[in-house]
Structure formats: structure tokens, C-alpha cells
Amino acid sequence: PPRSTLFPYTTLFRSKISNFVFNDLTREKIRRENGLEGKHVIGHVGRFMAQKNHMFLLDVFAEVHNLDKKAQLVLLGDGELMEAVKQKAEKLNLEKNITFVGNVGNANEWYQAFDCFVLPSIWEGLPVVGVEAQAADLPCVFSANITREIGFSESAEFVGLDESLNKWAKTIKKALQQNDRVDRTNLITEKHYNIEIEAQRLQERYLQ
């Protein structure tokens, strides 16, 4: 396949991992500016398209909200399904509990404001957002359809898309209770997710 289709990680690999490392001051700023103080924030970053499974994510969040009334879902990204997802949020009477941020240039700062990260994709390769979220030391809940290579931190969980909404909700609720975030730069480097190192590794893998 052409190189342009094999290396969708350019933005991340040209940046520095320190951009995503947890920063408490940034966390407080983003949460204060966006009315998220006191909320248990579930984050998702991705284009609004079928692959990313937003409709399923809303069903899961409805179950989470039944268990935790302080839960707030924050969605970064844009795309053709955004309006349909907004309509579903209204039908579920959750429009006040779901924040649609759109495309932003400071996604790395938004990761600081999250309490956990959820990626229920129908399929993925090695998702950059999963690396970013773990760089920010976020507990992550990934679809079991995503490669296990992405789960390099001890707080990464995988749940099958055929599992019940309650199973997903309980896994997310458990993730929300982990609040001891620290600088994980050393761990990420040890797991070969240093930006420069991984860029070279992926290029060698895909361009052989």
C-alpha cells in the first residue's frame, strides 16, 4: 500500500511526549473554563464516523449516568455523524451531560481535564489517541476490537463490544475511581512509545 495510507501517526510522532504528560494546573484551568468542576469526566477523541462507534458510546454513557449522576461525557472531534449523535443525546435526555467540544488545537490540554478515556471503536489499528491518553496517565477503557499493543499501562482495560452495557458501565465507573495520576514518561519510554523511537519502528514495520 502507498506510504500515505500506512503512517497516520505523523502529528503525534512529530510532537513531544511531554505535551501530553499530566499537568494539574492545566487540568484545573480546562475544567474551570468549561463547567466541569466537580464532574467525573469521561473523555473521547475521534472523528464522528461509524468506525468510532459514538452511538454505542452514548448507550454506554446512559448506563454510566444511571450509576453516577456526576458523570459527564466530553467528545472532541467533528464529522458527518455529529448531528445524529447530538440528536441521540437529546432523545436520551442527556444533552446537559454530554459536552460536544468539536475540533480543537489543544487536545493535549483536554486530556488533562478527563478522569478516564473511552475508545469503543469497531476497529482500529494502533490508535494515536490511545497513546496520548496513556501519556496523560488516564485510565483507559478500549474496545476489545482494538489491538492489545495499545494497552501499555496497567490502567488499560479491554471490553468486548458484545458485552453488556452494564459491563461497560461498571468498567468505566471503576476507571473513574482511579485518581492518582502522575508523570508516566519513563513508563512510556520503557514500553517503546517514545515518540522518535516509535516513529522509526513503525516506519520500518510498514515500509518493508
Q: Which stretches of residues belong to each language-model region?
A:
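Short hydrophobic beta-strand element within catalytic cores of glycosyltransferases
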Residues: 139-143, 148
